[in-house]
């Protein structure tokens, strides 16, 4: 999945989807150094997304069927990865919100004790007891499993 976060690798895949290229040709077209293009091509080759064809002194790179499938489904993959990051962001927000509520509860209970008011404070915000937490946990778990499954299916095609 590392290739998704590299604009150069995506550009290389798009170019190789048009026709086969050498490192020099890709370097000129994309405006990158030959060593940079070579690094990206080697990474794509290791992932099985491109293949090499040797013709005497020239080495041409071509996109594989797996590379074509990934390129075709690139938008879906980006959407899935974005969804995972959105879920992570929501979880972080939710956890910090709970920490804030628990800190407030501690301050309130301390104030009640200091003032000598002997009423029972029932405002527990422990997030394990909240139905919202359980619903959020279940939905997030299913979404993450579904997203991982879809990514796996797309890459394995």
Curated annotation (Swiss-Prot):
Using the UniProt record, give the first listed, main subcellular location: membrane
Report the superkingdom from the record. Answer: Archaea
One GO CC annotation = plasma membrane
> Which Pfam families does this UniProt record tie to the protein?
HTH_5
Compartments, as annotated in UniProt: Cell membrane
What GO biological process terms are annotated to this protein in UniProt?
Answer: regulation of DNA-templated transcription
This entry's Gene Ontology molecular function terms read: DNA binding; DNA-binding transcription factor activity
| Domain HTH arsR-type intervals | 1-85
Task: Write down the membrane topology.
Answer: Multi-pass membrane protein
Q: TM spans, by residue?
A: 76-96, 132-152
Keyword vocabulary terms for this entry: Cell membrane, DNA-binding, Membrane, Transcription, Transcription regulation, Transmembrane, Transmembrane helix
What is the recorded name of this protein? Uncharacterized HTH-type transcriptional regulator MJ1553
Species lineage, top-down? Archaea, Methanobacteriati, Methanobacteriota, Methanomada group, Methanococci
């Amino acid at each position: 999945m590392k290739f998704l976060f590299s604009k150069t690798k995506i550009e290389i895949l798009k170019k190789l989807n048009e026709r086969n290229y050498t490192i020099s040709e890709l370097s000129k077209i994309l405006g990158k150094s030959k060593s940079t293009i070579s690094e990206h091509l080697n990474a794509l080759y290791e992932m099985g997304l491109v293949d090499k064809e040797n013709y005497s002194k020239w080495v041409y790179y071509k996109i594989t069927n797996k590379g074509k499938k990934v390129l075709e489904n690139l938008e879906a993959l980006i959407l899935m990865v974005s969804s995972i990051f959105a879920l992570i962001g929501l979880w972080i927000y939710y956890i910090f919100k709970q920490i804030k509520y628990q800190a407030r509860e501690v301050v309130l209970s301390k104030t009640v004790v200091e003032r000598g008011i002997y009423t029972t404070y029932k405002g527990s915000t422990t997030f394990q007891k909240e139905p919202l937490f359980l619903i959020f946990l279940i939905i997030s778990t299913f979404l993450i499993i579904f997203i991982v499954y879809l990514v796996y299916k797309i890459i394995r095609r």
